[in-house]
Amino acid sequence: MYHLDNDSGVSTFALAPVKSTQRLWFTEGGHGNAISYPGADWFNMVQAELFSILDDAGIQPDKGRLNQISLAIRKLSEGKVEDFSQQLKQADGYKYIGRCKSVAELRTIRPTENGQRILVDAYYEGSTAGGGEFVADLQDLITPDDGGTCFVVPNNGGRWKRLFSSSLQDTDFGVIGGVADDTTNLNAFLDALRTYKVKGYFTSRHYKTSAALNIAGVDIEGVLAGYKNKHGTRITGNGNHNIFEQMGGELQHITYSLKNFALSGGIVGLKMTYAVNAVVENVFIDNVERAFLLGDSQFVGPIWCSLKNCRGEGRISGLEIDGNKWANANMFETCFFKGDEFAGSITAKGGIGAVSNHFVNTEFAGKGVGVKLGKNKSTAFDNCYFESEGPSLLIEDSTADLALNNATFGSLTENNKTGKTSFIHHSLGTCNMSISSGYIYLAGNNQNNLAFIESDKPESLVVNMATPVKREIYTATGFKLFKNPDLPNKNSRVHYTSGYVCEFSSQNKNAELGNGDLTAYYNLNNSRCAVGLNLKIGSSTTKGTGQWQFRLPFQASGIGKYYLGQAIAIKADGSKLMTGVARIVGGSNQVVAYFNNVNPADATRPFEWTEGDRLDISIEYEI
């Protein structure tokens, strides 16, 4: 490129005046038109335009090079493209691309080609959340607008679809939090999670709802922050509905995961029906009628589900496990349940009951019952804490293989609302329970006359207690390990020492203790029972006729078998001390003392009994 280079040129450039504002074109004449001529002014303008290109590119005109304009354009373009490319690579490079301000605006934009992409700043104009990248699908005319992942193009001309991989955020569906009712948007969010089978995240906001949120088949996680998650993800209902609810029992939706939520202000905090392998973790529920409701009597209950680090406080109950046919093998670890009527309940009315539900490091509290046990099998409590004002356990139906390991019992009061004053109260059904160690804490004057175990049907209660619970009793009085005199029964296996009321009689049934004294105790170690009796004759003791007999705490086993012990008769003045043999016949519930080998103790043997004389018996036998 070079300027005009001959003797006809001038060194000054004079801009010609405008003669026509209409755009004119060259012609070769004809049809009444003269031949066009460009003139020097036009060539000067073209030359000036070309020189401007070289100047912008920093290229000096070179008469010997005929590609300078091409080089200049390339140089100018390459620089700009490279700069823009580098700018796009920066962390904030998206700011150089055109963006849509909101979902509302996106709904008004019709894409021009399939696969076209667009960036949306936020769900609502002026906010910062819920935006993202969307791609146009002009072939999809069916998928409905779900308010978060798919938006219908105007006049049903296709769909804008959100690009995402393994998760979605609640704000992707326009959830606001605060005072707004987010029910519709939250359920749309949960519906999308079920549809696309991806995980959903909630922000640390306070959400208001007016209807239940369907958590069937979803994997959702909130933000965990503060005691009872009061600074994390919180969802509050209007008091007239359940908060989280598993709606339906379709097999593809019976497994789900819920983590890090505080729920309040509803009828039921979390209602699960037929759930399998569901995981509930760090869920805190209060200000509801029932906190956790797992299954119900009209529907099969949950199986293999896990609750961990959960807290449920309800005006009626903290936890209810039920099932029409089953509610089996569910795990509860490090939880807290509290209810004004009862903290927890476990039952399944069909089949063999609720089977193998396991509680570890879990606490039960409230003004009523701790845990109500209906029809169940193999329920286990390990290192649990019972601090209900009513019975810790109320057994109301057939209960097999109930296990209590290292449990702590406290807070039971004498005048609680249930009227029952034992930590474990067996009301109905056959029950077989095993107790290993544990601890009872009684510190108040309102804890007098309590017992550890009581039964309305003692013949139907079997207690296996190899290591008795420890007791720490301060001002309380009148505590008994077993409230019933006929507990533990012969079918129980316990390690236990206790006094008992022993009946003194003669063979002809006419002996009476009168003002005498008879103390009796037994030590039961599984099926082996050691008995000690101390009889002191009083001034009004009637000796009767025939051999003396003393009632045992339990019937001896082994018909045709004999058990031998020791008997000692002592005169009050110490003048005589006679040793003999105590004998129990298998199948009997009486012990008899013999002296001189064959003579049973009676009114005159081994000597004439008078006031102050004593008879001591010690013997062991199998029950």
Swiss-Prot record:
Q: Which domain of life is it from?
A: Bacteria
Q: Which family does it belong to?
A: To phage Mu protein S.
Name of the featured protein: Mu-like prophage FluMu defective tail fiber protein
